[in-house]
Amino acid sequence: MTLLLDTSLPTAGRLDGRTVVVLHAHPDDEAVFTGATVRRLADRGARVVLVTATAGEMGTPRFAVDDIAAVRRAELERAAEELGVARLVLLGRRDSGLPGWESTAHPDALLRADLRALGTTLARLVEREQAEAVVTYDADGIYGHPDHVAVHLVGRYAAGLTGRTVYESTVDREHLHFAGAHVLDAATASVRGTRYGRVTAEITTALAATPSELAAKRRAMAAHTSQIDPAELDDPGFADAYELEWFVRRGPAGLLDELGNVHALA
């Protein structure tokens, strides 16, 4: 199946006074998987509330740091500013790391949390913010990271409590097979036995970034200097790998479907 998207300037109207809650597992996920979408929402006047579950303590820094959690929180704040996020909320759980790591047994690890309780907390936030939609991950957490799977469960539970439309962030594995280098190349190698993303036919909604949105996404990714090599962002294949963002929608058409060159596929 071939997906053709109009990459010209979107024509949708303003979204002033409307809100979406975007849930991610670690700092940098917001930029990599939803950066262009968040930037477009903000540019159209929507209020974007970014919720990040952990500080990404188990991410391997590219250089020596004294407090990786503090560094990554600061990077997240800079990235959120680049993307136009109106409010940043940290759930305060600890990065669980990967299967087999001792960190998964840490009492504060996201994997050890009561996910229903976290979902209830998120639902209260959704109601307080009067958000119309919740963005989370697909059922496999895009590439099988345990924290991403947990975030999927938390997001779906909160959406179920509030009756909101859910957009499950994912990637199109058929597209990325032919695209340039992507951070998922290394991520999937660290999680064995998992196929990343979805095939094109499973994706319901896709957004093509405009040049300005892609530039904002690149800047947001660049803010995460402890994790992302700036040279990767200068790769000639950057646009091929990152200009599209994909979702599986659960529920009626909602806010993300009103963003212009977003195409509903099913």
Where are these regions (language model features)?
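Active-site rim/loop-helix segments in enzyme catalytic domains that contact anionic ligands
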Residues: 1-129, 157, 248, 254, ...
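The feature marks non-catalytic terminal segments
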Residues: 2-7, 161-266
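Histidine-centered catalytic micro-motifs
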Residues: 23-27, 145-146, 220
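Active-site environment of divalent metal-dependent phosphoester hydrolases
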Residues: 30-31, 57-60, 139-144, 174-176, ...
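A structural signal for short, well-ordered beta-strand segments and their strand-loop junctions
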Residues: 50-52, 89-90, 133-136, 144, ...
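Short, well-ordered secondary-structure micro-motifs
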Residues: 61, 101, 146, 178-181
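Short, electropositive alpha-helical surface patch
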Residues: 104-109, 150-154, 189-192
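Active-site adenylate/phosphate-handling loop in enzymes that bind or generate adenylated species
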Residues: 119-163
